[in-house]
């Protein structure tokens, strides 16, 4: 496929659009035309810097992003939750035991979590044993509480890292962001007060393993760097570059979103927050190889055209389109006026939309005004057709739009954070506060004598009150009965005696045995 290279080379433009490729190049302005001979025609070298004087090249080493580095933005880790397993038993009067199991939480420490994680990954049986529910004990008429603290490790727990600020992003974090994990605090708070997130690698040395060393050639003008050819032969200008630090490594962001790092880049402007870098993958590398091959092929076509012109001693408007500089920068423009070949030195600027240079029918905008053709001829193979339309040779290529779509689909700016603030979980409940956490032995506590009733002292007081009340009622009733008897006895003594009308014979009274013997008949 014949790939128009001028739609690809981003690094020579001066604007700061992300991921946009120049559609075309046109002179900023055209001044005086100078007649030349055919032997003065020259093909532009689009692999060199566009700036005058930046022709000296020297080899150097630079750092760029690894291909497919997005896979390294996932930071593996684990969550650590403090759990208190509790077994509570009560033995009643007849020896019946009731057991209740409970679970509470406590806030763990980083050191204890790291130890528990090492136990788990190494297969240490202590980790599994720490999660078991404690064996309950019992005591007659007492409540025995047995507790056991343990740390629950859940792994892997993957979070995303923002390579711009080395912050971690996950919905499990209270604000969606953990920004203080570097360098002194090796853990992140979560939405649960009793759960911590820790990275698998305590030193986090592998998190930013996203750079690779490459070799290129610098384009120099004295001690000043104009740009460089990367390892694939693709020229990149430092125009429009800004300083940007990734994962603690200082570097520069080129205007097309490419990030590189080398010593003394001579760039002093810091990037704004909306200037992001583009991903780097194998597909982009392949496209760059195609670009370089196509640039070379375009130059070969231009040289073939020049050879044909010199051999035939004839030049056409269409052939002049091969001599246009395909990328923004300094170059030459050619035209034919009154049968003479003309040239002028110009600076080519980028064109992103055809409407920018073709605002209306029959108008080719150069600078701030429409350029008038001479007998239907403009420059670089551009002519005005019989119907008044401006005809640009590159506009007739159907492959241009296809390749534009291909290239635009191949560039994705890396936008962070990827976590939506609305997806952040809310806090649910308060956690118990514990201090001086370690892996303790099973703890057992035995209560005082318990009769099996909740708040039995209170109920005993109520029972004693009821008994006292009943006793009091009984005493009152007894007292009331005695009082009634006394009153009834007094009423009987006050009743008057009645005498009968007939005499009642008196009984004989015998005072003693001697008197009894002296009675008649004895």
UniProtKB/Swiss-Prot annotation:
Instruction: List the Virion surface topological domains.
Output: 20-455
The record's Gene Ontology cellular component field reads: membrane; viral envelope; virion membrane
Can you tell me which residues the record assigns to a coiled coil?
none
Q: How does it sit in the membrane?
A: Single-pass type I membrane protein
Q: Where is this chain's protein located in or outside the cell?
A: Virion membrane
| Lipid-substituted positions (S-palmitoyl cysteine) | 480
Q: What Pfam families does the entry give? A: PH_Rhabdo_glycop (PF24834), Rhabdo_glycop_CD (PF24833), Rhabdo_glycop_FD (PF00974)
Industrial or biotech applications? Primary surface antigen capable of inducing and reacting with virus-neutralizing antibodies. Almost all human and veterinary vaccines are based on the functional aspects of the G protein.
Which intervals lie on the Intravirion side per UniProt?
Answer: 477-522
Q: Where is the signal peptide?
A: 1-19
Q: Which residues cross the membrane?
A: 456-476
- What does the PTM comment state? Glycosylated and palmitoylated by host. Glycosylation is crucial for glycoprotein export at the cell surface.
**InterPro entries, alphabetically?**
PH_Rhabdo_glycop, Rhabdo_glycop_CD, Rhabdo_glycop_FD
Q: Which residues are glycosylated?
A: 221, 338
SUPFAM superfamilies in the record: Viral glycoprotein ectodomain-like
Q: Which Gene3D superfamilies has this protein been placed in?
A: 2.30.29.130
Give the similarity note: Belongs to the lyssavirus glycoprotein family.
Q: What is this protein called?
A: Glycoprotein
């Amino acid at each position: 496929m014949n790939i128009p290279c001028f739609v690809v080379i981003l690094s020579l433009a001066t604007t700061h659009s992300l991921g946009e490729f120049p559609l075309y190049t046109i002179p900023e302005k055209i001044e005086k035309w100078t007649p030349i001979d055919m032997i003065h025609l020259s093909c532009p070298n689009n692999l060199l810097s566009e700036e005058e004087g930046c022709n000296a090249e020297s080899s150097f080493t630079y750092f760029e992003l690894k291909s497919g580095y997005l896979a390294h933005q996932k930071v593996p880790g684990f969550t650590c939750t403090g759990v208190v397993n509790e077994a509570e038993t009560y033995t009643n009067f007849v020896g019946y035991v009731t057991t209740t199991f409970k679970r509470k939480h406590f806030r763990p420490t980083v050191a204890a979590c790291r130890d528990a994680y090492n136990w788990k990954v190494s297969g240490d049986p202590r980790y599994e044993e720490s999660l078991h529910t404690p064996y309950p004990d019992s005591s007659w008429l007492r409540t025995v509480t047995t507790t056991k603290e343990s740390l629950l490790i859940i792994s892997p727990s993957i979070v995303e890292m923002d390579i711009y600020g080395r912050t971690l992003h996950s919905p499990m974090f209270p604000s969606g962001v953990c920004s203080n994990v570097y360098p002194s605090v090796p853990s992140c708070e979560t939405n649960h007060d009793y759960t911590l997130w820790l990275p698998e690698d305590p030193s986090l040395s592998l998190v930013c393993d996203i750079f690779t060393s490459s070799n290129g050639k610098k384009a120099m003008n004295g001690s000043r760097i104009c740009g460089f050819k990367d390892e694939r032969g693709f020229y990149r200008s430092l125009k429009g570059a800004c300083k940007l630090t990734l994962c603690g490594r200082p570097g520069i962001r080129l205007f097309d979103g490419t990030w590189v790092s080398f010593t003394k880049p001579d760039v002093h402007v810091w990037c704004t927050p909306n200037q992001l870098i583009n991903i780097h993958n194998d597909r982009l590398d392949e496209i760059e190889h195609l670009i370089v091959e196509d640039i070379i092929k375009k130059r070969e076509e231009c040289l073939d055209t020049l050879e044909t012109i010199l051999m035939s001693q004839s030049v056409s408007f269409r052939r002049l389109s091969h001599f246009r500089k395909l990328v923004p920068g300094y170059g030459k423009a050619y035209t034919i006026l009154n049968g003479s070949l003309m040239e002028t030195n110009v600076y080519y600027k980028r064109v992103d939309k055809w409407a920018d240079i073709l605002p209306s029918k029959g108008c080719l905008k150069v600078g701030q005004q429409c350029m008038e053709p001479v007998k239907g001829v403009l420059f670089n193979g551009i002519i005005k057709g019989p119907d008044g339309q401006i005809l640009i040779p590159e506009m007739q290529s159907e492959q241009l739009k296809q390749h534009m779509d291909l290239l635009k689909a191949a560039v994705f700016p890396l936008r962070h954070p990827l976590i939506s603030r609305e997806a952040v979980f809310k806090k649910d409940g308060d956690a118990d506060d514990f201090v001086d956490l370690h892996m303790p032995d099973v703890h057992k506590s035995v209560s005082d004598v318990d009769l099996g009733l909740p708040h039995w002292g209170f109920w005993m007081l109520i029972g004693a009150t009821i008994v006292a009340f009943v006793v009091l009622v009984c005493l009152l009733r007894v007292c009331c009965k005695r009082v009634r008897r006394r009153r009834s006895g007094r009423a009987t003594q006050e009743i008057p005696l009645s005498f009968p009308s007939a005499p009642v014979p008196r009984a004989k009274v015998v005072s003693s045995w001697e008197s009894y013997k002296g009675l008649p008949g004895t």
